[in-house]
Amino acid sequence: MKFGERKTMEKIRVLTAGDSALLIQFEQRIGEDVNRRISATVKLLKMQQIEGIVDMIPAYASLLVQYNPLVIRYEEIYKRVSAIVKMDTKVESMEKKVWEIPVLYGGEQGPDFSYVAEHAGISGEELIRLHSEKDYLVYMLGFLPGFTYLGGLEEKLHTPRLENPRVKIPAGSVGIGGSQTGVYPVDSPGGWQLIGRTPVKMYDPEKQDPILVQAGEYIHFYPITDSEYARISEAVASGNYSVQWHKEG
């Protein structure tokens, strides 16, 4: 699959995925237009309130619809889902939700910051500017609870993963792996190049909705200082910090 934009969508297929799920396959490439089509399909399915659907899991170019076969028969769910994917979703008019995520770049929080800048042939200041000037689309969640696979990374910042992955990466670490960037939501092993860290909790099991950002939404990183990092960390720990977001479109 390749990143890219096209004006037309190839035929969408609805496939059987075991005895309690359907897999909707969209055009098999990675692109914002494909992702918008997936998000629009999720929205339509929710609006239909089809009894028996228990979960929907979006990926780069597909949507897994899980259902309870004791509540709705295969023939019925297949018919209704197939009808929905044929509908005009008007994806161009969808709103864009953007989360503002603070990041302390470099230093102890970004041990690979200098390497990424050197690999790109740019200064540290330019690395921060390039990484923090875009809104990144959350194509999907995976690998870990709340781990965001983000698209739109400046090509100059594309950096190979570590040859020897780290045994433990602190929660909140912001990394680059190949053509993608993302945030580690919990302490975990990992092989991405770490350029900074956010004090924000991307995953909080104590909350009713533990995952902060959902697939189809956007993340905008903005640089902060050491003192701001310490202040926000304290506010997060005491439960007095709310991550800012806005809508566009």
Question: Where are the model-predicted features located?
Answer:
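Glycine-rich active-site loops that engage anionic ligands at enzyme catalytic sites
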Residues: 2-249
